[in-house]
């Protein structure tokens, strides 16, 4: 069973939400954050991308940066840019992209559920990134940014969400830059709060869609606080961390593509000939070619697009990891032909989220920056959940979710 609870969210007043809300800390660099926050002292970047308040070149992991985050978080509250609700609520957060809306419940997720595997992971985390987020949680004593969860479809929750979203929202705005819609309601009726809690308690698992490092950091800090408290009871606020939970049937995973700097000493002809061992290779010409389904790949090289279809026998349908296109391409193209052994550390490879389109792959190859691009058919939510359920881990850079959660709509304090 998944344990969740409502919480007293800290939120911007309605008239300030568009100034406060920001993109997540990990989808933009310091230079981009400086540009987006320019002239806006209320931007959440002054809490989550603190290096922008220091001279250019300041190490974002400097202790002074973390201290400034806590100082600014308090300042935002003192100035009334962030105000705590006086009652424990759940919240509904809807995102609209390209005319499609997905509705998430904002809840306090239970730290022990993360530790004992009820909250399921599909990615490995890096300790240095965990520690960075842990410092941020510690100094602020809060989850400033939420994690993105998926839950099994649930009709009773659908009914409650429909009831609230028929009413006027607390926030409703279009984010600058991406044009995505962000809408927000408060679930404040006790009977509905009780039903939501009870329905989650029936769920065997929740699934991290995006935010593995934030989840790990929040859970580890919660466990730290429990250990440090001689009177720990288990119901303290630090036992919970903020998550936005979406029904799995509303989520779409976007392709996550690869670009590589060189052909590992091969000529284009030798490279294509090497691919012929495991793939049916078809030239598609100058027009962009998109993968048509599982085990079909799109390759861009020398101004031409190619279709690659994995030959029978090159993968195992009964292996939940081996059957993934990201695994097939990693083993049979990136490793076997291009000599790229470690996707995490090899400097010859870069990754491009599908939201940028296949034109971005063409652009990076045509510019001479990269030599070849590889586009993959996206994994499904079912594949993700099956892999998490079996305790397996997806290869690096497998999933890309869009739209990203907007930060700053609500914050969860740990006391």
Region locations from a protein language model:
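Surface-exposed, charge/polar-rich loops and edge strands
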Residues: 1-415
